[in-house]
Amino acid sequence: PGQLSSRAFSHEIHGVRGLALTMVVAFHLFGQGRVSGGVDVFLVISAYLMTGSMIRSLQSGKLSLVRRYGKTFSRLLPPALLTIVFTVVVGLMILPRSRWLGLFEGAQASSVFMENVYLGTAGLTYEAAGDSASPFQHFWSLSAQGQFLILWPLLAFLILKLFSRISGDTRVRIFFGFTLVATGASFLYALLLVGIDQPVAYYSLWARMWEFGAGALAAFIMPWLQSLRKLFVGALGWMGITLILSSGFLIDGATKFPGAWALWPVMGAVLVLVSADTGGAIDVGLTRVLSWKPIAWLANRGYALYLWHWPLLVYFLSVKGQASIGYLGAAAVLAASLILSELSTRYVSAPAVRGANGALTSPAGSGKLLAILIAAAVGVAAL
C-alpha cells in the first residue's frame, strides 16, 4: 500500500456518514422495525478514517496512544454520557420498578462501551422499538465502535514498537497483512455464528470486525485506485449510494446481519469511499448532493440524533402503553430528537471538542484529558 491521501475533510464521506445515521433513525421511527443498514455503513466509515490515520502514523513513526484516545473519546463520550444520564433520570420517573435493574445495567454497560457484550451475554435479541425495549439498546453499535477505536490504535502502536527499526512502508505492509487476515477470519466467523446463533452474532465485535475490516482495507488500497478514470469511480459512488439506500427496503437485516447479506450496505459504503477519495464524486455530481446544506446539517448532528432518538422513542411508547408508534407519534419523536441533538451538539459536543483540541497540544494536557474522560465514564457507570 502506498501513501494515503491526508486530505483533512471530505464532504462526501461526512455526508454519507450523516446519511447513514439518519437512515437508522428514520427506519427506527417509520420503518416498522426494519434494519436500515446505516449502522453497517457507519462502522465501515469509522474504520476507514481511523485506519488512514494509523497508516500515516506508521509511516511517520509517531503515534501517541494517549493523544489518540483523548481526541477520539472527547468527541464520543460527552454527548453519550449526557444521554445516558438523561435516560436513567427519565426512566426512573416513567418505568416500573421491575425494569429499574435493567435500566441501571444498560447504563453501566453503555458508559464503558460494553452494551453489545451485555446484550449478547444476556441473550437479548435485537428487537424493534416497543414499550418493553431497552432504552440503551442502540448503544450496542457505539460500544462495538468504541472497542474497535481502542483496539485498532493499540495494534498500530504495537507494530510501531515491535518493528521500530524497519521502514514505515514495511510497517504499513505488516498492518495490512494483519488486517487482511483478521477481516477474512471475522467474515467466516460471522457466517458460522449467524447460522448457529444470529442474535449473538448481531452484537458481537468479532462477528462485526469484517465490516470494520472492509473500511480498513479500503484505506490501504486507496492509493492504488487514484489512477482510475474519474467518471468510472464516480459511477461507482452512485452505485454505492443506491446500495446503501436500498438495503433497509430489500434485506431483513435484523435476522440476516452480520452475515453475507451485510455485504450489501458494506460494499455500498466502500464504493462511496472510493468515489470520494479518488475525486470521481466531483465529476458526477455526488459531491454536490452529499454536501447539500440539509444533508450537511444532519451530518453535523447525526451522532447526537442517533443518541437521542431511541430513548425518546422507547419512553414515548412506554408512556402511551403502545407496542408500536404511528406516523404522528414518530414525527413528534423526530422533532424532539432534532431539537435535543441541536442543543447537545451546540452546547456539549462542540465545546468539548474545542477544549480537547487545546488540551491535546501537549502530552501533559493529553494525559489529563484522557484521565478526565475515563473518570467521567466510570463515574456515570458507578451511579
Which residues does each PLM region occupy?
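Membrane-interface helix/loop caps of multi-pass membrane proteins
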Residues: P1-L360, G367
